[in-house]
């Protein structure tokens, strides 16, 4: 038992060396994962009296890209990336309302500050926040089995505020972040609505130290 107790500090130090980068170092991390997103669209009325409504539902999509990081100090790092994400929302079929799906294809640049909570006790665990600049590549809607491009109904630029947590073990990086939409994406002239895209990303990456 005493031997195990004596080995624990050395084990913790070993894991810390594997997970924590030195100040002044660079790394690049390709990552891939899934996201759950929704647009803040108005409710759909299910009857003419407007007594029953249906909210937009989350939809699942793919997230993939690459991020580079600079370790400023032991607890602070800055990162920038180029990420693709397929986001949107959907309304399920209910009553006289047909199923409708909205798909948005974004190319985004996340600019983040990463705060490593306690490098000695919790090596590799960090909180992150910053700003994300997105560009809408294409938008498609599916109604009654027919898919049409409706990119003109959306503004191209999407600004969001990401906040998340990540864990690095050796070269494996697990990341969970929530992107809060800031800009109104609705450009439809006949609609006085505010469409913001909120999404939760879960990705797994492999870190290459430069």
Annotate each PLM feature.
Residues 22-28, 34-40, 67-140, 203-210:
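Gram-negative (and chloroplast) outer-membrane scaffold detector with strong preference
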Residues 20-61:
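Short glycine/proline- and aromatic-enriched beta-strand/turn motifs that initiate or cap beta-hairpins
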Residues 1-25, 209-210:
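Cleavable N-terminal export/targeting peptides
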Residues 52-56, 68, 99-101, 149-153, ...:
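Outer-membrane beta-barrel proteins
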Residues 24-28, 58-62, 103-109, 123, ...:
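Residues that define the transmembrane beta-barrel architecture of outer-membrane proteins
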Residues 40-48, 90-97, 139-146, 186-191:
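Outer-membrane beta-barrel translocator domains and adjoining extracellular loop/strand segments
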Residues 81-83, 87, 151-210:
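Predominantly the C-terminal beta-signal and adjacent terminal strand-loop region
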Residues 124-166:
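A charged, solvent-exposed segment within the mature domains of Sec-exported extracytoplasmic proteins
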